Regions:
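Alpha-helical segment proximal to the catalytic Tyr-Lys
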Residues: 119, 163-167, 224
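Active-site loop immediately N-terminal to the catalytic Tyr-X3-Lys motif
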Residues: 92, 139-145, 167, 203, ...
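Substrate-binding pocket helix/loop in short-chain dehydrogenase/reductase
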Residues: 90-91, 95-100, 185, 196
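C-terminal substrate-recognition "lid" of short-chain dehydrogenase/reductases
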Residues: 126, 204-233
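Residue(s) in the substrate-gating loop at a strand-loop-helix junction
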Residues: 134
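Conserved glycine-rich cofactor-binding loop
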Residues: 16-17
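Active-site helix of classical SDR
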Residues: 114, 150, 158
Length: 237
């Protein structure tokens, strides 16, 4: 699916920085036409790139964004639901507003973009949806009750969508990154990060290229028979 002839269109949420920015540039370099979305503007300029300021947890925003993709591009071949927020805190000290904000962005945002994106994919003969979980889910990390719950929900959602969307030739798979040096973990105490890394089978920080390796795999034409799967980076020790 990485052959730019015929033109292939991808939407990446959370595209302004971090993993999303890396993946945007990665797939632009492969000839994809990429629509990136985030709540803020971007400085990325490329002939094959368009940016939409979108709150993925806002249904009207998502419907509008996918509507623009339909109008301008006429198709959607791949959706990478990368947008996410995180907060580490003991369960007893986590405000309801924090838990709600995490669930809305991480889970509801994935739900809404997948729903609207799949409608467009269905019209052009299929596509690939790649959702983002976290190594924290299988590791059951203390201090991440709200965050891990949102990511676990994404895993369950993805398995059901894999079944419901299979008749339309749409695959739905998940990548679960390890901690990567992005804004998402910048304020996490160093000791907490070290404890997390020690619980991985391969105890190191992840790299953007590690994530791209998995998304590349899911996007390969030969991966059309793979759906409902999760690949966790770093391994679970």
């Amino acid at each position: 699916m990485n052959d730019p002839q015929p033109r292939k269109v991808m939407l990446i949420s959370g595209a302004r920085k971090g993993i999303g920015r890396f993946l945007t540039e990665h797939y632009l370099a492969q000839g994809w036409h990429v629509v990136g979305c985030s709540r803020g503007p971007t400085d990325l300029q490329h002939d094959y790139y368009r940016h939409a300021q979108t709150d993925v947890a806002n249904e009207d925003d998502v419907v509008k964004t996918i509507g623009e993709v339909r109008k301008v591009e006429g198709r959607l071949d791949a959706l990478l639901n990368n947008a996410g927020v995180a907060s580490m805190n003991h369960f007893l000290l986590t405000p309801a507003r924090t838990a709600e904000a995490i669930m809305r962005t991480n889970y509801l945002g994935t739900f809404l973009l997948s729903r609207e994106g799949a409608k467009l994919m269905r019209g052009n003969g299929g596509g690939r949806i790649i959702n983002f979980s976290s190594i924290g889910v299988p590791l059951k990390l203390e201090g991440e009750a709200a965050y891990n719950a949102s990511k676990a929900a994404i895993g369950e959602l993805s398995q059901i969508l894999a079944r419901e969307l299979a008749p339309f030739s749409i695959t739905v798979n998940v990548v679960g990154p390890t901690p990567i040096a992005t804004d998402l973990i910048r304020n996490v105490p160093k000791a907490s990060m070290e404890r997390l890394l020690k619980r991985q089978a391969i105890p190191r920080f992840g790299a953007f290229a590690d994530v791209a390796n998995v998304t590349d795999f899911y996007l390969r034409p030969e991966s059309c028979f793979i759906t409902g799967q999760t690949i966790y980076l770093g391994g679970v020790s």
